[in-house]
């Protein structure tokens, strides 16, 4: 049977329990929101095929449990990931502070050239905000990665986040396939204008 896609990208969602990783994944894969999800046990995944630059890209997106007791299970999935989204809840300062710990987990267990992005989720709950957008931007900039505020509930920036991460992975793959750039070099070449800076920031806007 012929393949129905040109690329297969494995993505990973990590972050503390309750930050909305499952809701973000469900919004992207099913375009739906369910406020009654229970905490993920171990690991689960969804698949969605998208089109970028005329290529069909199959996204296999793994949703990991945030609890410490599942850490051994979930870190085993880091190595094969091509892109990782680190998610915190803007209404939970502790989940934001723990992003640094999640970054350390990536450095220990994931591929050195994995694409990363930080998501400040639940930005629709602005009245309960504990983490400012500027704090999120500053943290992402300190790691040299992209940042977006998102809301699975209000469907803000979810699509944009996954497409941006997939586009960055594809740009990196295309460069490697060309064979004219050493690994680890600047990834800015051939990236479209809306991706030129790895520390780009995206605002949460409620319409």
UniProtKB/Swiss-Prot annotation:
<feature type="short sequence motif" description="Switch 2">
    <location>
        <begin position="63"/>
        <end position="80"/>
    </location>
</feature>
<dbReference type="GO" id="GO:0060271">
    <property type="term" value="P:cilium assembly"/>
</dbReference>
<feature type="propeptide" description="Removed in mature form">
    <location>
        <begin position="205"/>
        <end position="207"/>
    </location>
</feature>
<dbReference type="InterPro" id="IPR001806">
    <property type="entry name" value="Small_GTPase"/>
</dbReference>
<dbReference type="GO" id="GO:0007409">
    <property type="term" value="P:axonogenesis"/>
</dbReference>
<dbReference type="GO" id="GO:0005886">
    <property type="term" value="C:plasma membrane"/>
</dbReference>
<comment type="similarity">
    <text>Belongs to the small GTPase superfamily. Rab family.</text>
</comment>
<dbReference type="GO" id="GO:0005768">
    <property type="term" value="C:endosome"/>
</dbReference>
<feature type="binding site">
    <location>
        <position position="40"/>
    </location>
    <ligand>
        <name>Mg(2+)</name>
    </ligand>
</feature>
<feature type="binding site">
    <location>
        <position position="17"/>
    </location>
    <ligand>
        <name>GTP</name>
    </ligand>
</feature>
<dbReference type="GO" id="GO:0030496">
    <property type="term" value="C:midbody"/>
</dbReference>
<dbReference type="GO" id="GO:0098969">
    <property type="term" value="P:neurotransmitter receptor transport to postsynaptic membrane"/>
</dbReference>
<feature type="short sequence motif" description="Switch 1">
    <location>
        <begin position="31"/>
        <end position="45"/>
    </location>
</feature>
<feature type="binding site">
    <location>
        <position position="40"/>
    </location>
    <ligand>
        <name>GTP</name>
    </ligand>
</feature>
<keyword id="KW-0472">Membrane</keyword>
<feature type="lipid moiety-binding region" description="S-geranylgeranyl cysteine">
    <location>
        <position position="204"/>
    </location>
</feature>
<keyword id="KW-0460">Magnesium</keyword>
<dbReference type="Pfam" id="PF00071">
    <property type="entry name" value="Ras"/>
</dbReference>
<keyword id="KW-0488">Methylation</keyword>
<dbReference type="GO" id="GO:0031267">
    <property type="term" value="F:small GTPase binding"/>
</dbReference>
<keyword id="KW-1003">Cell membrane</keyword>
<keyword id="KW-0333">Golgi apparatus</keyword>
<dbReference type="GO" id="GO:0005525">
    <property type="term" value="F:GTP binding"/>
</dbReference>
<feature type="binding site">
    <location>
        <position position="22"/>
    </location>
    <ligand>
        <name>GTP</name>
    </ligand>
</feature>
<dbReference type="GO" id="GO:0005813">
    <property type="term" value="C:centrosome"/>
</dbReference>
<feature type="binding site">
    <location>
        <position position="63"/>
    </location>
    <ligand>
        <name>Mg(2+)</name>
    </ligand>
</feature>
<keyword id="KW-0636">Prenylation</keyword>
<dbReference type="InterPro" id="IPR005225">
    <property type="entry name" value="Small_GTP-bd"/>
</dbReference>
<dbReference type="GO" id="GO:0007030">
    <property type="term" value="P:Golgi organization"/>
</dbReference>
<keyword id="KW-0968">Cytoplasmic vesicle</keyword>
<keyword id="KW-0653">Protein transport</keyword>
<feature type="modified residue" description="Cysteine methyl ester">
    <location>
        <position position="204"/>
    </location>
</feature>
<keyword id="KW-0656">Proto-oncogene</keyword>
<keyword id="KW-0479">Metal-binding</keyword>
<dbReference type="InterPro" id="IPR050305">
    <property type="entry name" value="Small_GTPase_Rab"/>
</dbReference>
<dbReference type="GO" id="GO:0019003">
    <property type="term" value="F:GDP binding"/>
</dbReference>
<feature type="binding site">
    <location>
        <position position="66"/>
    </location>
    <ligand>
        <name>GTP</name>
    </ligand>
</feature>
<comment type="function">
    <text>The small GTPases Rab are key regulators of intracellular membrane trafficking, from the formation of transport vesicles to their fusion with membranes. Rabs cycle between an inactive GDP-bound form and an active GTP-bound form that is able to recruit to membranes different sets of downstream effectors directly responsible for vesicle formation, movement, tethering and fusion. RAB8A is involved in polarized vesicular trafficking and neurotransmitter release.</text>
</comment>
<feature type="binding site">
    <location>
        <position position="39"/>
    </location>
    <ligand>
        <name>GTP</name>
    </ligand>
</feature>
<dbReference type="GO" id="GO:0006887">
    <property type="term" value="P:exocytosis"/>
</dbReference>
<feature type="binding site">
    <location>
        <position position="152"/>
    </location>
    <ligand>
        <name>GTP</name>
    </ligand>
</feature>
<dbReference type="GO" id="GO:0055038">
    <property type="term" value="C:recycling endosome membrane"/>
</dbReference>
């Amino acid at each position: 049977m012929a393949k129905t896609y040109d690329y297969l990208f494995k993505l990973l969602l990590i972050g503390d329990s309750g930050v909305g990783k499952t809701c973000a994944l469900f919004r992207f894969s099913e375009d739906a929101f369910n406020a009654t999800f229970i905490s993920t046990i171990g690991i689960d995944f969804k698949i969605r095929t998208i089109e970028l630059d005329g290529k069909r890209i199959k996204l296999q997106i793994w949703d990991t449990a945030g609890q410490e007791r599942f850490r051994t299970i979930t870190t085993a999935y880091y190595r094969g990931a091509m892109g990782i989204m680190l998610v915190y809840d803007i209404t939970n300062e502790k989940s934001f502070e723990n992003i640094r710990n999640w970054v350390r987990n990536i450095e220990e267990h994931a591929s050195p050239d994995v694409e990363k992005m930080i998501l400040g989720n639940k930005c629709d709950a602005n009245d309960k905000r504990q983490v400012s957008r500027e704090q999120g931007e500053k943290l992402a900039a300190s790691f040299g990665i992209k940042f977006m505020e998102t809301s699975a509930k209000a469907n803000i920036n979810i699509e944009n986040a996954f497409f941006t991460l997939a586009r960055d992975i594809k740009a990196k793959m295309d460069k490697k396939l060309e064979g004219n750039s050493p690994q680890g070099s600047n990834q800015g070449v051939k990236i479209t204008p809306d991706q030129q800076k790895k520390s780009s920031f995206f605002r949460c806007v409620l319409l």
